[in-house]
Amino acid sequence: MFVSIGNSRMDKKFNCTDMTYEDFVSRLSKTKYTAETMEQYRKMPKGQQDNIKDVGGFVLGKLKGGRRKKDCVISRSAITLDMDYGTQGIIDELEMFFDMKMVVYSTHKHTPEKPRMRIIIFLTRDVTPDEYGAVSRMLASDIGIELFDDSTYEPSRLMYWPSTSSDGEYVFQEIEGNEVDPDEVLSRYKDWHDVSAWPVSNRQSSIVQRDIKKQADPLSKDGLIGAFNRTYTVTQAIDKFIPDVYRHSRAIPGRYDYIPADSAAGVVVYDDLFVYSHHATDPCCGKLMNAFDVVRLHKFGDKDARAAEGTELSLIHISEPTRPISIS
């Protein structure tokens, strides 16, 4: 199976290699113990935690040019799910109730009282990025979708190799079963291309509306941004400036399709002030955007990537997009 490997989450290019199941599982079976204790790790700011657990990572699949970007995933060779809300005895339940070939290992924040696991489910064939979203969400729903991190279904999602605090517990378990046939999973949908039919957690069902309430009224923004938003509604801006990116969906009136994707109706417009894309391969997936944001990100988003880290957005002549939120 193809695995794209990076030495750090900061790597610009990941190396794709064809690994055997045995070699891949062998690497997961051993953890790297880090110097800090569990209590010290718990009290650290998130950035410091991220640096400690970054012992290199992988994406199970092929990446275009080795780039780990949303629109650079060619295919995925297995499903990887982060179980951030695990329950005690969850591994026994997976073994007892599911006939799927899986590997489970604990993440850096795992404790026996609050299990945090990474589950890898092996497939009979590679899947496209859009198929990945539909298959991973259906399988998570079977297990219990409330158990999983809401951003875990992104095809470009990096998974770290195992690491554990010096006094922490590392858990690793191979679970015997059959490789999952993606076509059988997809057939359980009336139409898997319809993103609106994909399972979501209760957290996701309210997060967009909650985030809208936190955002400033786009019509009241100062300067060029406010003027643009007052001149063009979201739908007017999309139809005029990026009709080659989004098109009106036939599946659900009032929604848009992301044209390069196989899935449909994943772009939702809210009161013609905000737009949110659920399409996993959309570079704007997971961002709540006003009219100015959606145009500038699709037309000039590469300026973000070229700017040095920490550069003020005003210095590269673009606005700050509304805060990304974890939903796919």
Go through each PLM region and give its residues.
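Signature for HUH/AEP ssDNA processing cores
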Residues: 1-115, 122-134, 138, 202, ...
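N-terminal single-stranded DNA-binding subdomain of primase/primase-helicase replication proteins
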Residues: 73, 240-301
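Short secondary-structure junctions
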Residues: 99-102, 147-149, 238-251
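Hydrophobic/aromatic-rich, well-ordered segments within soluble, folded domains that form packed cores
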Residues: 108-128, 132, 181, 185-199, ...
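Short, conserved secondary-structure transition motifs
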Residues: 112, 122-127, 148-175
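Long, charge-rich alpha-helical interaction segments
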Residues: 177-228
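Acidic, glycine-rich loop-and-strand cores that form catalytic or ligand-binding grooves
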Residues: 219-246
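Single conserved hydrophobic/aromatic residue that forms the stacking wall/gate
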Residues: 316-327
